[in-house]
A protein has these predicted regions:
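12-transmembrane solute porter fold
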Residues: 8-19, 28, 229, 256-426, ...
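Hydrophobic transmembrane architecture of multi-pass small-molecule transporters
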Residues: 406-508
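Hydrophobic transmembrane-helix bundles of small-molecule transporters
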Residues: 157-276
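Helix-loop-helix hairpins in multi-pass membrane proteins, especially solute transporters
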Residues: 64-200
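Extracytoplasmic
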Residues: 8-63, 148, 288-292
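Cytoplasmic loop-to-transmembrane helix junctions
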Residues: 44, 129-136, 305, 393-400, ...
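Interfacial helix-cap and linker-helix signal at transmembrane-aqueous boundaries
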Residues: 34-35, 66-67, 151-160, 214, ...
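Central cavity-lining transmembrane alpha-helices of secondary-active solute carriers
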Residues: 50-63, 114-118, 311-324
Length: 517
């Protein structure tokens, strides 16, 4: 008997999904604090996010398959326990190596929550209600991603330490486990299969190579660094790895192994297109991580308050996800994704080109949030299950879509960090251009400020602090203009990439609309 109304089990599924998705957003507000705590560079610190998203990408399909084999209730509870235990280890980390290992354990727990919750909804709710319910699930996922920095900033301000960002997960996990053990029904039909361990290893290794390749691009010498083995060589090896992955899955089709990326799904053009859209939607999520640093460095908001500026986008994404689910129920997935893509392009386009003060930022972040929520909510999940047609089970389909999305989330921060580094590497030339237009030269810059900029011994706040001490108003304004030009150059490509991703989603939906019906 399928449900028509929202029930208490669905509520706790939403809480579990929210808890896991919150973690990547919550850490973005504390990255600087964590890096200082372990005395590591910002580039090294980004692995705290990267390893978590990679772990989730690998775990998502495995958890979905284990849920089909042993039951959704059992695997969901194990996932929550793993996540809570990992959170405790992260909070107690004595060094950065331990921190990274703990984050990986945490990701193994968080990776299966969304796919199991989605599968539960599709299996237990009527078709008329599935769009709204999946929209609510997408809303939790989206709101958590963008609300995380808010909560992170609040907890750091209240507690004075980053450890509580992770300790707070422990009692929530205990509550979910206790409730689900009593109330959540177990899957009635279970499928016994073998886990595709070789494909998982190849996928993980290839994705790591891709991330290292992007990370090795030298912002001061892009052309030569791209041609080096550490970039182009690793990229080629990653592509070979993905090719081997497809070959492995092709061979697995004739066996009883439950494929990591099922070849019978990859053979369906419509489903392959949905996977591409999944990667692109993951990149949209990845762009949100950099909003706090954007408002801090571009809009000059205090670091402690930067996470709060995610609130409008967070609320808008929740509204967008909910609306997206209802539109799917009434107008269909194609119409919903077309609207989502157009709204996203307008919002992210405004953030890229028109955001020079707080008011335009608020307006365009709300628009971007609406489109973002629409996109990651119900439309893609419903489209994936429809385009798969003969899929053996919903968990496999949703799990495969989640893998593609996690690939986008995993690679995007590494790519966007490279954009930021390139933008800031142009600071010297931008300042020089600004000084020349104001009839000044580099010789007019105070020695103390030149030392900070040349040796990168300070962050942007420290540099601006030195600039504000310059008594000559014209000189101070010229230097500030150069710094602001470099800062915009650092962040504009992030939002421009989101615009391009949204446009490609719109293009794919339009071109393949007949195949999706």
């Amino acid at each position: 008997m399928k449900h028509k109304k929202f029930d208490i089990v669905a509520l706790f599924l939403l809480i579990g999904v929210f808890m896991a998705a919150l973690d990547n957003g919550i850490i973005s507000a504390a990255l600087t604090t964590i890096n200082q705590s372990f005395e590591i560079s910002a580039q090294m610190g980004s692995w705290g996010i990267t390893i978590y998203t990679l772990g989730m990408a690998v775990t998502t399909p495995i958890a979905g398959k284990l849920a089909d084999m042993y039951g959704r209730k059992k695997i969901f509870i194990i996932e929550v326990i793993l996540f809570g235990f990992g959170s405790l280890l992260v909070a107690l980390s004595p060094n950065y190596t331990f921190f990274i290992i703990a984050r990986l354990i945490q990701s193994f727990g968080g990776g299966g929550l969304f796919v199991i919750a989605s599968s539960h909804i599709i299996s237990t709710y009527t078709k008329e209600k599935q769009g709204s319910m999946l929209g609510g699930l997408g809303a939790m996922n989206g709101i958590a991603s963008v609300l995380g920095p808010n909560i992170g900033s609040l907890l750091i301000n209240v507690s004075g330490t980053w450890h509580w960002l992770f300790l707070i997960n422990v009692p929530v996990a205990i509550m979910i486990v206790n409730f689900m053990m009593i109330k959540m029904p177990e899957t009635q039909e279970k499928v016994k299969t073998k886990i595709d361990k070789y494909a998982i290893i190849v996928f993980s290794f290839s994705t790591l190579l891709m991330m290292f390749a992007i990370n090795n691009i030298q912002t001061g010498n892009i052309a030569n660094s791209i041609l080096s083995f550490s970039v182009i060589g690793l990229f080629v090896l990653a592509m070979i790895g993905y090719g081997i992955l497809i070959l492995v899955e092709y061979k697995n089709e004739a066996t009883d192994i439950d494929a990591f990326l099922p070849f019978y799904l990859l053979k369906k053009p419509a489903f392959s297109v949905v996977l591409i859209m999944g990667v692109l939607s993951g990149m949209l999520i990845g762009s949100i991580i950099f909003i706090p640093s954007f408002v801090e460095n571009v809009l000059h908001v205090k670091a402690a308050n930067s996470g709060y500026w995610m609130t409008p986008l967070a609320l808008a994404s929740g509204v967008g996800a909910s609306m997206g689910g209802k539109i799917v129920d009434k107008k269909g997935t194609i119409f919903a994704l077309v609207i989502a893509s157009i709204i996203s392009m307008i919002g992210y386009g405004g953030l890229a080109f028109l955001t020079y003060s707080t008011m335009p930022f608020l307006v365009f972040s709300i628009i971007a949030g609406l489109g973002f929520g629409f996109t990651i909510g119900a439309p893609m999940t419903v489209l994936a299950t429809k385009s798969a047609h003969s899929a053996k089970n919903n968990s496999t389909v949703i799990g495969t879509l989640s893998v593609s999305r996690q690939v986008g989330i995993t690679i995007a921060p590494t790519m966007f960090t490279t954009f930021i580094q390139f933008g800031y590497s142009q600071m010297g030339s931008k300042i020089k251009e600004s000084l020349n237009s104001a009839h000044f030269g580099l010789k007019d810059i105070p020695v103390s400020l030149m030392n900070i900029m040349e040796h990168r011994s300070g962050n942007l706040t420290k540099i601006l602090g030195q600039v504000n001490q310059i008594s000559n108003d014209t000189l101070r304004r010229a230097i500030t203009n150069g710094i602001e030009d470099a800062t915009h150059l650092a962040y504009m490509p992030i939002f421009l990439t989101a615009v391009i991703a949204s446009f490609i989603i719109l293009l794919l939906v339009t071109l393949f609309r007949k195949e999706f019906k």
